[in-house]
A protein has these predicted regions:
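Conserved ABC ATPase "signature" region
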Residues: 4-12, 103, 107, 114-132
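Helix-to-loop junction immediately C-terminal to a conserved catalytic motif
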Residues: 54
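Conserved ABC ATPase signature
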Residues: 95, 136-140
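Hydrophobic anchor residue at the start of the ABC signature
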Residues: 150
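A short, proline-enriched helix->beta-strand linker immediately N-terminal to the Walker B motif
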Residues: 155-159
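Catalytic Walker B motif of ABC-type/P-loop ATPase nucleotide-binding domains
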Residues: 161-164
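Helical segment within the ABC ATPase nucleotide-binding domain
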Residues: 176-189
Length: 213
């Protein structure tokens, strides 16, 4: 819009709409159990691509498949097979404890109480959550929250885990701890990892293949 009050009024009455292609000409495949880095500058369409792969956004053209499932047609079915962590957005209810959040996620994914409790116990031990699993999320440090975010996304044993800037804002020691936990999940549960990050350490230490957009 034009500068000043006049420009603001003019833009409100006669808005100018400019069409921008967020993602165009992107084509790739990911192998089962692979740890892949999907990187590029800000505005390249990394997060938009993840949102299309997970069914949050629908592409205007082309074809998207995750494990043979079209996210635009069977998003609910796909949700049971994938997990997502957006480093700059929270999926946990901050007034609840991690434990209560995990139980809620277990119910969302139709796990029995026994299955949920067993999975919480397994992941809490693996991710070292015992000291703060009963503390409201709003009182946790950023590193503790990220660990809990990852655990929440793994409650239902997804086959694919989408990680969008999972270590953003973390100090070097906590970053390495989170990376090791991600490596462990890939190694032990054969979880496919689709990672976006501006942190070279994430890319070098986690992924064997890189796609640049």
């Amino acid at each position: 819009k034009e500068k000043g009050m006049r420009g603001s009024i003019k833009a409100f009455i006669h808005p100018r709409i400019e069409e921008i292609q967020a993602v165009n000409g992107v084509s790739f495949s990911v192998e089962e159990g692979e740890m892949l880095a999907f990187i590029g500058p800000n505005g390249a369409g990394k997060s938009t691509t993840i949102k299309m792969l997970t069914g949050i956004l629908y592409p205007d053209g082309g074809r998207v498949e995750v494990m043979g499932i079209d996210p635009t047609k069977k998003r609910r079915q796909l949700a049971y097979e994938i997990g997502t962590v957006f480093g700059q957005k929270e999926q946990l209810w901050t007034h609840l404890t991690p434990y209560d959040n995990f139980r809620f996620f277990g119910a969302i994914y139709d796990l029995s109480e026994e299955e949920t409790e067993a999975r919480i116990g397994e992941l809490a031990e693996r991710f070292g959550l015992a000291a703060f699993i009963d503390t409201p999320v709003r009182n946790l440090s950023l590193g503790q929250r990220i660990r809990c975010e990852i655990v929440a996304s793994l409650i239902h044993k997804p086959k694919v885990l989408f990680l969008d800037e999972p270590t953003i804002g973390l100090d070097p020691v906590v970053k390495e701890n989170v990376r090791e936990l991600i490596r462990q999940m890939n190694r032990e549960e054969h979880t496919t990892i689709f990672l976006t990050s501006h942190d070279v350490g994430d890319i070098e230490k986690l992924c064997r293949r890189i796609i640049i957009v």
